[in-house]
Amino acid sequence: DYTVHDKVHPNKAGAEKMATVWFEALKKVLASSETVFSPEIVRYKTLEDGDSLALHIFKPRNMQAGEKRPAIVYFFGGGWKLGTPIQFYRECAYYASKGMVAVSVDYRIGYLHHSTPFESFEDAKDAICWLRSHASDYQLDPDKIAVAGGSAGGHLAAALGTIGSDETVPAGYRPNLSVLYYPVID
């Protein structure tokens, strides 16, 4: 379990201020029953230190047995140092209300794991591969997976579609579509 301080901001005052802003914004979103979704939080990776990373999965309410839906997978921003999957809960709830499976990914960040963007990218690849291998469990179409993200998360989404494009790299993590919000690219 994480606290706001663990995942949002490196100092207590900043964490409390950011949490207040986010929770006030969430109140407006959650006021409508159409956008109220409780994600299923599923572990997709266990790290060497025993910590685990999770996918926050939002499923449409009107899914029928055996039906496959397209998915959109979000990666939060924060300079690979800070951030939380909560950043894209509003977007995930919106897409779930429109019939898509929406996922917000937890990945390693520098503040908690002393990691680099390279480890974050490995986590992003593992998240997509995990979703594809468990597609039937969540009724998602493994051939219709979009990725999205802002800033550092946009970098991860862009990298999933471009890095390792030669034939020696398995394409299980390659998205079918990328939606990039102000990505860090050169």
Residue ranges and their predicted role:
Residues 71, 99-106, 146:
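A fold-wide structural signal in alpha/beta-hydrolase
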Residues 13-17, 21-24, 90, 94-97, ...:
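Extracytoplasmic/secreted proteins, especially bacterial periplasmic and envelope-associated proteins
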Residues 84-85, 91, 103-142:
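Catalytic nucleophile-loop/oxyanion-hole region of alpha/beta-hydrolase
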Residues 67-78:
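Short beta-strand element of the alpha/beta-hydrolase
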